[in-house]
Amino acid sequence: MFGMVPFRRNNNGLMRREDFFDKMFDNFFSDDFFPTTTFNGNAGFKVDIKEDDDKYTVAADLPGVKKDNIELQYENNYLTINAKRDDIVETKDDNNNFVRRERSYGELRRSFYVDNIDDSKIDASFLDGVLRITLPKKVKGKDNGRRIDIH
């Protein structure tokens, strides 16, 4: 009605709706098993964060990632999750020749600001592609400080 079409590429750098969907379908149908849009660093990975009275619980979906390729760090009130994925799918015929060989590599990082955490009690587990992190809160009213000796 007013000529406003989302995803239109003019000289202003916006993409036309048709180009957006054409590219999406081209990428989808040309990449059999490892779509690049799911683990390329731009899309990120999905994270659920739940707050309870005494803790935060984080669940991060990391499909295709091995436990050894996950690094978890809590520093300066930031929880940082680093994950790498290196997948190789090989299919050979009876003569040991490759019929298909595909590789998929990706690296992701996400950081979250979470304060009032008892960092000595942070716990994490990884099962079935889901990283679960428990971040206990500091106890209210308890002296959470420590004495600092002067040398």
UniProtKB/Swiss-Prot annotation:
The keyword Chaperone applies. Induction: By stress; by heat shock and also at the onset of solventogenesis. Pfam families: HSP20. Keywords: Chaperone, Stress response. Residues 38-151 form the sHSP domain. SUPFAM superfamilies: HSP20-like chaperones. It comes from the Bacteria. Belongs to the small heat shock protein (HSP20) family. Probable chaperone. This is 18 kDa heat shock protein. The lineage of its organism: Bacteria, Bacillati, Bacillota, Clostridia, Eubacteriales.
